Design a protein with these regions (language model features):
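A secondary-structure capping/hinge motif
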Residues: 49-51
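Hydrophobic alpha-helical connector segments
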Residues: 61-101
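Hydrophobic/aromatic residues within well-ordered alpha-helical segments
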Residues: 5, 55, 59, 84, ...
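C-terminal peripheral helix-coil segments that are non-catalytic and often amphipathic
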Residues: 126, 161-187
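Amphipathic alpha-helical packing segments from all-alpha helical-bundle domains
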Residues: 107-133, 138-146
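Basic, helix-initiating cap at the start of DNA-binding domains
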Residues: 1-20, 24-36, 53, 62
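Short hydrophobic/aromatic patch on the recognition helix
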Residues: 36-45
């Protein structure tokens, strides 16, 4: 029942944030729409940002599990590669696009996402360092973890920023630039 209540609250919150904007929806609004007490919302989520990132722990467990729970015949690098490819597939889903568009719309959510990534990086560094195939140096372990998490960020960036990139690439394309007298295209 607790997990179902938590999931219901998170789904309602995400819908409200997406429909009305993150900054325009309060915890009381979420509680009212989810038909629970405000104290129930806070019993499940420590902050408003945590409502959006309700899968934070699951994501970290999946990253660490990609290293710790891989099959004996799979190398450390191949396990991380497979996890990154799963992330790329997820980032191309409509749900992901909507989610990351919401995150990009709020400075508070971007900040929370950055802090979350730092926690995930530390957990992944620990998992990599304790692996038998771990690189010899702590710096190499950290670099491998950072590369993996940066690949996640890069996978999501084109999707959430596509409208901005499309607009800037159109305005900077040769066809959209004013022509100089005597240039080849004006001849």
């Amino acid at each position: 029942v607790k997990a179902a209540t938590r999931n219901h609250i998170a789904e309602v919150a995400l819908r409200l944030f997406t429909e009305h904007g993150y900054d325009k929806v309060g915890m009381r609004d979420v509680a009212e729409e989810a038909d629970v007490a405000v104290t129930t919302v806070f019993a499940h989520f420590a902050s408003k940002e945590a409502l959006v990132f309700d899968q934070d722990e699951h994501h970290e467990e999946r990253l660490v599990g990609a290293v710790a729970n891989r099959s004996p015949d799979q190398s450390l690098l191949n396990a991380l590669r497979a996890e990154v490819l799963n992330a790329v597939r997820w980032f191309s889903t409509p749900k992901s696009i909507s989610f990351w568009t919401l995150v990009e719309s709020s400075a508070a959510l971007r900040g929370y996402a950055s802090q979350m990534q730092a926690r995930h990086e530390q957990a992944l560094v620990s998992a990599i360092a304790s692996d038998p195939e771990a690189p010899a140096s702590a710096t190499a372990c950290r670099a491998l973890a950072r590369f993996t998490l940066d690949a996640y960020s890069l996978a999501g960036a084109p999707i959430t920023r596509w409208p901005q990139w499309r607009k800037s690439s159109i305005s900077s394309s040769p066809a959209s630039r004013p022509q100089r007298a005597g240039s080849r295209r004006s001849r």
